[in-house]
């Protein structure tokens, strides 16, 4: 993860390489070294994160496929966000895991550029699909009539994926297979000095973290205001209903209007607030996981005296990787019926197969018994015919 777009000194701090940051052609005199104990811990944690991300998001996609409410708007965005998290696991966590095992990149230049490109594609997609889902929840609360256009959702998701593919294109130019020491090659970034690293890391931080967080904060600010407004409306409607009941039949129309307003507010507070809570927790997990990583990157490029300890980069990278496997557990917490349906479907299929195999065995056993019975009767009749009759 730290190698997805990080400058060379980030990789230098983690891997222990002494290659100068952003320079081409300068090499170290001795072979590169690294902290093997720290590398083993990183490999173990990344392996666990990869397993949880693959299994969790695969279960979410399978549950969304088998549910009866698969055409729900929220489930549509959850499906694409799970696909993006799978992309992060396969194209970002897995290459980083293999890279930590081998220490150096072993592959052609084309593979180096492709891996670096796909690493950032998954990161962009996960961020902006989360942003898209939050905007959808904001529209569902603030403007429910406009949120009913499903075709617009599909176009927005398609545009998001295409935009992520385009925004990740600079990775192909920046990273390449280069000689970082005498006879040692690695997938390395080369920037124009001295402003290149600052410009690129700042742009990535703005595009993937700061701007999305600002938009997400605005969305949930509007959602909070709308919820507060509806709660206030509910209180006023309840008071109007009570006053209408006290005044009698003369205020019957006002009482009915109050009841309608109350039922409308209850609908918002029960049917939509739960989904808003879920997306808010997903956003909060995104902020918690990615803040140390981007803070460390920005500190490294803008402060020449910033510490470059390997442990700090490792912790920030592992925390960022954790975001790809925590979303399925959040989905499970707020939409538990999805996984209950999946478990029930699995148990039903297993029971049917078991019952079918038992029925097959029973039918075969019955056929064997009937065939044995026929043979025994036939043999007994033959014995009775062969015996002489006695008077």
Curated annotation (Swiss-Prot):
Q: What does the record say about its membrane topology?
A: Multi-pass membrane protein
Annotated GO biological processes are:
cellular response to hormone stimulus; female pregnancy; maternal process involved in parturition; positive regulation of vasoconstriction; regulation of systemic arterial blood pressure by vasopressin
Q: Glycosylated where?
A: 8, 15, 26
Which residue ranges does UniProt annotate as crossing the membrane? 39-63, 75-97, 114-135, 155-175, 203-225, 278-296, 312-334
Q: Per UniProt, what is one GO molecular function of this protein?
A: oxytocin receptor activity
Question: Which residues are reported to carry the modification Phosphoserine?
Answer: 370
The alphabetical list of record keywords is:
Cell membrane, Disulfide bond, G-protein coupled receptor, Glycoprotein, Membrane, Phosphoprotein, Receptor, Transducer, Transmembrane, Transmembrane helix
Q: Which residues lie on this side of the membrane: Extracellular?
A: 1-38, 98-113, 176-202, 297-311
Any one GO CC term of the record:
plasma membrane
Localization recorded for this chain is: Cell membrane
Which SUPFAM superfamilies does the entry link to? Family A G protein-coupled receptor-like (SSF81321)
Question: Is Iron-sulfur one of the keywords?
Answer: no
Q: Which InterPro entries match?
A: GPCR_Rhodpsn, GPCR_Rhodpsn_7TM, Oxytocn_rcpt, Vasoprsn_rcpt
Task: Answer yes or no on keyword Chaperone.
Answer: no
Topology, Cytoplasmic side: 64-74, 136-154, 226-277, 335-391
Q: List the disulfide bonds.
A: 112-187
**Which Pfam family, any one of them, does this sequence belong to?**
7tm_1
What does the protein in this record do?
Receptor for oxytocin. The activity of this receptor is mediated by G proteins which activate a phosphatidylinositol-calcium second messenger system.
Provide the family line.
Answer: Belongs to the G-protein coupled receptor 1 family. Vasopressin/oxytocin receptor subfamily.
Record-linked PANTHER family? NEUROPEPTIDE RECEPTOR-RELATED G-PROTEIN COUPLED RECEPTOR, OXYTOCIN RECEPTOR
What name does UniProt use for this protein? Oxytocin receptor
Q: Which organism is it from?
A: Ovis aries (Sheep)
